[in-house]
């Protein structure tokens, strides 16, 4: 799902069914919002899904975001988590890196 935000950001939301409960975790923050980078916040949420909300300055890339997130979720089928992403034009490789870093923090 995609919506416009008054500041010109595009907001994308995705939900994936999870199979690996994250349990009671402290919020994890990785990355830095800046040119060509992004910030990922991963935190516990009610339910068994992995929900993702993206605020991005790079409009029109919903299908690419979905592909990157599906790939991440295949590697890390987390359940009961909410992922919030603030993006300033990061490449798919950087997005994957930051998501993997957040998942590694949860696993440790």
From Swiss-Prot:
CC per GO annotation: cytoplasm
Source taxon at top rank: Bacteria
Function: Subunit of malonate decarboxylase, it is an acyl carrier protein to which acetyl and malonyl thioester residues are bound via a 2'-(5''-phosphoribosyl)-3'-dephospho-CoA prosthetic group and turn over during the catalytic mechanism.
Entry protein name: Malonate decarboxylase acyl carrier protein
HAMAP family (UniProt xref): Malonate_deCO2ase_dsu (MF_00710)
Gene: mdcC
Record's keyword terms, sorted: Cytoplasm, Phosphoprotein, Plasmid
Chain positions found as O-(phosphoribosyl dephospho-coenzyme A)serine: 35
Protein's cellular compartments: Cytoplasm
Disulfide-bonded cysteines: none
């Amino acid at each position: 799902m995609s919506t416009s935000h008054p500041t010109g950001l595009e907001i994308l939301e995705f939900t994936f069914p999870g199979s690996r409960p994250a349990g009671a975790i402290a919020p994890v923050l990785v990355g830095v919002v800046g040119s060509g980078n992004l910030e990922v916040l991963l935190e516990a949420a009610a339910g068994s899904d992995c929900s993702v909300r993206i605020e991005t300055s790079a409009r029109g890339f919903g299908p690419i975001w979905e592909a990157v997130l599906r790939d991440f979720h295949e590697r890390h089928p987390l359940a009961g988590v909410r992922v919030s992403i603030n993006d300033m034009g990061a490449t798919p490789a950087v997005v994957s890196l930051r998501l993997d870093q957040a998942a590694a923090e949860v696993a440790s």
